[in-house]
């Protein structure tokens, strides 16, 4: 009996971390994080997989958020996902009207391809094309990747605490 319960638990847990969900976008946190409401009125926080958008207080952070909002806010989307991040957000590819929203953010230069975690060729190509055309954040001569921006912010906080 205990073995059956364990097997059922593992199957249900796995299904939570692999698959597809659909819902209406009800919140845009920033340029790579949204919240959707599914048909059961459950909220799901989604981190767009494979991209890293500028932080809210970083150059192009608000433009990135606004563009993502123009693509998905109030619309029905599908999310294909494999896992969750350390904050419990679903890591997924968001589709609106059949378009890969993650890819669209890269095409207009309002996110970096998060190569550390993703190797999608189309994402790398979109980032390169936006960079070459100096679109979005690529207008800056030396844009700072969000990961570096966050690290510098943590270091400043630690230094001021000492």
For each predicted feature, which ranges?
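Small beta-barrel nucleic-acid-binding modules, primarily SNase/OB-fold domains
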Residues: 2-4, 10-162
């Amino acid at each position: 009996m205990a073995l059956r319960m364990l097997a059922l638990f593992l199957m249900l847990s796995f299904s939570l971390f692999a698959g597809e969900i659909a819902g209406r976008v009800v919140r845009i946190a920033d340029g790579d994080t949204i919240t959707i409401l599914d048909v059961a009125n459950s909220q799901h926080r989604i981190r767009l997989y494979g991209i890293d958008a500028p932080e809210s207080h970083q150059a192009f952070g608000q433009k990135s958020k606004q563009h993502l909002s123009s693509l998905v806010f109030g619309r029905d989307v599908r999310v294909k996902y494999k896992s969750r991040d350390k904050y419990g957000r679903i890591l997924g590819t968001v589709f609106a009207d059949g378009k890969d929203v993650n890819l669209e953010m890269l095409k207009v230069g309002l996110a970096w391809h998060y190569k550390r975690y993703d190797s999608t060729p189309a994402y790398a190509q979109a980032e390169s094309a936006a960079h070459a055309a100096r679109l979005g954040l690529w207008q800056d001569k030396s844009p700072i990747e969000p990961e570096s921006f966050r690290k510098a912010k943590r270091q400043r906080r630690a230094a001021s605490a000492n």
